[in-house]
């Protein structure tokens, strides 16, 4: 029996770990063995497993692969064997409702998180669930309904002995921690400033002390104690919509945010104060602005975001929030990590190391790899920057490709992998020059971020999961 256990442990370890959205602490980086640059249906393919649709990314833990999907309108967590891709089990989650979603979102967008023994999944149409590695349900926690204009897309993470979930929405945003073992709520803290974001947090481990949970929000980023949810550290100065995952490299944290093109520096427009708006547009003199009263066509297109209560009118606090939203600037911001309470004045300038504000992505998160920042925007413009100084190394579309990107870049074995919506996975040599090694077409759409573990590259398309490696 002892020999069997050792073999099983080694077998699980051999497949490596990529146990949450974007892998080790959300960095998108693997210290994996050799990875192929060229791959496809007839090259470097270890296996292909057809799967129902879903936008969640594959994760790998304990020799198992986990992801979520929707099949015949039902919500499922899938477990695959890492070695051959065989489906080990699938478990259905209740579907209490159908949340409204942006066309690029999906009911199975959130990525699971796992340790060697258990997996934790989140479906916005139900809540949180946990299963053993063999598919036995351990607990479930109904949550919602939610009110995010895009639909909820954030993924859970593990911190110490809790599962953490950030729910940023149009109203009543919060961060929640539940016990890994029993699914009971340990703490829940409001995030009153947070709007419709989708940024999955990262964890700062502190030996002998509770970990910090680093979670971007509208206009700011907070570090919460995993023990009780106390806000310990924070900086201000971020955009209003945060969807990317922050990346910690050394003592710096990198995070990008994009709201609208009108939040780019130089494209912002002057907006009237509340009193000026009332004087101009409040024709019925009721102290509010009805949609039909609003005369500015540019502002009217954002009506659904401004009318946060959904009552068909704008009131003073909603307009002031809109002014703050439109005053914030898109950008990649790099901050120095701090000690507890050292930003109590709320002044981010003392912590800001550098920022960059051109071709900023809305959805893809960045990668910091071998002292270079790789920032890929939704339209396929790749920016490489010196990680220490922010000096621009190169900004260009990937050579010969004109693609949209919703998946985030990942890195390993001296290579950068970029998976486009149309199903082309470009492979670049690591470095600021953006040297293209190969462009591999899978002929299937991709929304999910690839995973790297144990010398294998896992790519999920809308219809299958591929495993590529050196043969």
Model-flagged regions — what are they?
Residues 1-7:
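Sec-dependent signal peptide recognition
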Residues 11-13:
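N-terminal signal peptide c-region/cleavage motif recognized by signal peptidases
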Residues 15-471:
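Noncatalytic, solvent-exposed loop/strand surfaces
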């Amino acid at each position: 029996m002892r020999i069997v256990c050792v073999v099983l442990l080694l077998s699980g370890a051999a497949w490596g770990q990529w146990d949450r959205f974007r892998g080790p602490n959300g960095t998108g980086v693997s210290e994996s063995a050799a990875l192929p640059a060229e791959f496809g249906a007839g090259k470097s393919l270890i296996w292909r497993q057809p799967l129902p649709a879903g936008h969640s990314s594959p994760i790998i833990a304990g020799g198992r692969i986990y992801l979520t999907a929707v099949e015949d309108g039902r919500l499922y967590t899938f477990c695959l064997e890492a070695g051959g891709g065989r489906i080990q089990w699938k478990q259905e989650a209740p579907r209490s409702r159908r949340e409204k979603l942006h066309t690029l979102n999906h009911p199975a967008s959130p990525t699971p998180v796992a340790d060697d023994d258990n997996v934790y999944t989140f479906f916005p149409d139900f809540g949180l669930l946990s299963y053993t590695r063999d598919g036995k349900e351990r607990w479930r926690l109904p949550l919602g309904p939610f009110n995010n204009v895009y639909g909820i897309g954030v993924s859970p993470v593990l911190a110490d002995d809790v599962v953490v979930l950030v729910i940023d929405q149009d109203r009543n945003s919060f961060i929640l921690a539940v016990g890994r073992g029993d699914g009971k709520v340990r703490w829940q803290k409001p995030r009153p400033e947070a709007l419709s974001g989708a940024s999955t947090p990262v964890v700062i481990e502190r030996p002998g002390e509770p970990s910090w949970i680093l979670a971007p929000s509208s206009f700011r980023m907070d570090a919460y104690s995993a023990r009780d949810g106390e806000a310990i550290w924070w900086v201000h100065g971020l955009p209003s919509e945060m969807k990317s995952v922050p990346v910690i490299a050394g003592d710096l944290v990198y995070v990008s945010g994009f709201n609208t093109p009108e939040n780019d520096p130089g494209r912002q427009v002057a907006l009237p104060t509340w009193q000026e708006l009332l004087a101009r547009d409040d024709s019925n003199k009721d102290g509010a602005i009805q949609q039909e009263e609003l005369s500015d066509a540019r502002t009217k297109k954002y009506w659904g975001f401004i009318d946060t209560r959904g009552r068909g009118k704008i009131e003073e606090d909603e307009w002031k929030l809109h002014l703050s939203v439109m005053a914030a600037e898109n950008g990649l911001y790099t901050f120095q990590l701090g000690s507890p309470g050292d930003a109590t004045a709320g002044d981010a300038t003392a912590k800001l190391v550098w920022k960059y504000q051109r071709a900023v992505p809305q959805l893809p998160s960045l990668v910091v790899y071998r002292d270079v920042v790789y920032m890929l925007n939704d339209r396929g413009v790749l920016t490489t920057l010196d990680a220490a100084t922010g000096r621009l190394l190169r900004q260009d579309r990937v050579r010969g490709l004109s693609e949209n990107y919703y998946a985030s870049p990942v890195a390993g074995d001296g290579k950068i992998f970029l998976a486009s919506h149309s199903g082309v996975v470009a492979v670049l040599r690591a470095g600021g020059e953006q040297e293209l090694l190969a462009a591999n077409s899978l002929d299937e759409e991709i929304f999910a971020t690839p995973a790297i573990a144990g010398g294998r590259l896992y790519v999920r398309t809308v219809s299958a999961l591929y495993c590529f490696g050196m043969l």
